[in-house]
C-alpha cells in the first residue's frame, strides 16, 4: 500500500458489544522516494440483494425458458473505477436462499468505457478458477473457497476469492467489472464483494453501505423449506400421497 505523504488506518467498532482489548501491529518501510510508476492501493465493499427476473428464477430452465443477457445492464457491479490502473483481486460472498446452483452468472468486464464487455466469463466458479459447482473448501495463494455450505444443495453462505497477481486487468480510463446473479440475472441472492485495485493516483471510492445496509439476510433453513412444502400441499388439495414432483 504505497504512500508518499502519509497514511491513516482506522478501526471502528460498529457492533453493540464493548471490546475489552484490541491487538494489532503495522509494518512499513520508509523510502527516500517511490518509483514514478508506483500506483495507489484501493479497495471497495459493495452489497446488494439482487432481483430475480419478472418471469421467475428460471435457472437451468427449471421453471421456465432461459433468456439472453445482451448488455449486462442488470449485472451486479463489484468495481466501478474512473482513472488509470490495474485490477488485482476480489472477495465474493454469496448467500443463496434456494438449493439451486447460484453460480451460472458470467463475469463481464467493461474496460475504458466500452458499451459491450470485452472480457466475458463462462460462469461464477470459472472466474474463481474452479468448475462443476464446487462444494468443498479449498484455499490457494491466489484463489479459493474458504467457506461452503453442504447442507441442502447450494442453500446458504459461500465465500470465494481470487487475486489477479499474475494476470491483472489493466485499464487506461476506467473499469466497470460486473457479474450476473444467475444466468441472465435470474436469481435473488444476497451478494457482497470487496474489490482491490491500484490506480496511478489516490481516488475516492464509492460510498459503502452503512451498518444496516451490510446486515445479512437470515439463513433459509430446512424448517422454512418444509413450510413451503406445506403450502404446496395445500395448493394441491392436501392429498395424502403427495410426493413433490406432481
Feature map (PLM): residue ranges:
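Beta-strand-centric surfaces of beta-sandwich/beta-rich domains
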Residues: 1-246
Amino acid at each position: 500500500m504505497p504512500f508518499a505523504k502519509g497514511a491513516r488506518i482506522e478501526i471502528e467498532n460498529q457492533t453493540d458489544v464493548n471490546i475489552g482489548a484490541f491487538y494489532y501491529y503495522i509494518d512499513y518501510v520508509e523510502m527516500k522516494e517511490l518509483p514514478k510508476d508506483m500506483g495507489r492501493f484501493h479497495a471497495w465493499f459493495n452489497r446488494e440483494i439482487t432481483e430475480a427476473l419478472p418471469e421467475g428464477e428460471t435457472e437451468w430452465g427449471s421453471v421456465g425458458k432461459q433468456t439472453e443477457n445482451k448488455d449486462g445492464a442488470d449485472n451486479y457491479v463489484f468495481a466501478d473505477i474512473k482513472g488509470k490502473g490495474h485490477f488485482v483481486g476480489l472477495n465474493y460472498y454469496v448467500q443463496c436462499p434456494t438449493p439451486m446452483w447460484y453460480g451460472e452468472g458470467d463475469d463481464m468486464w467493461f474496460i475504458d468505457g466500452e458499451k459491450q464487455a470485452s472480457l466475458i466469463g463462462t460462469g461464477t466458479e470459472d472466474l474463481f478458477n474452479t468448475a462443476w459447482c464446487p462444494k468443498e473448501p479449498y484455499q490457494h495463494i491466489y484463489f479459493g473457497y474458504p467457506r461452503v455450505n453442504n447442507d441442502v444443495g447450494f442453500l446458504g453462505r459461500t465465500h470465494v476469492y481470487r487475486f489477479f497477481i499474475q494476470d491483472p486487468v489493466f485499464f487506461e480510463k476506467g473499469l466497470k467489472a460486473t457479474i450476473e446473479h444467475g444466468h441472465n440475472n435470474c436469481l435473488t441472492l444476497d451478494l457482497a464483494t470487496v474489490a482491490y485495485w491500484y490506480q496511478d493516483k489516490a481516488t475516492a471510492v464509492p460510498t459503502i453501505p452503512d451498518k444496516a445496509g451490510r446486515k445479512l439476510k437470515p439463513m433459509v433453513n430446512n424448517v422454512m423449506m418444509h413450510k413451503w412444502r406445506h403450502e404446496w400441499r395445500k395448493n394441491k388439495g392436501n392429498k395424502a400421497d403427495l410426493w413433490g414432483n406432481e
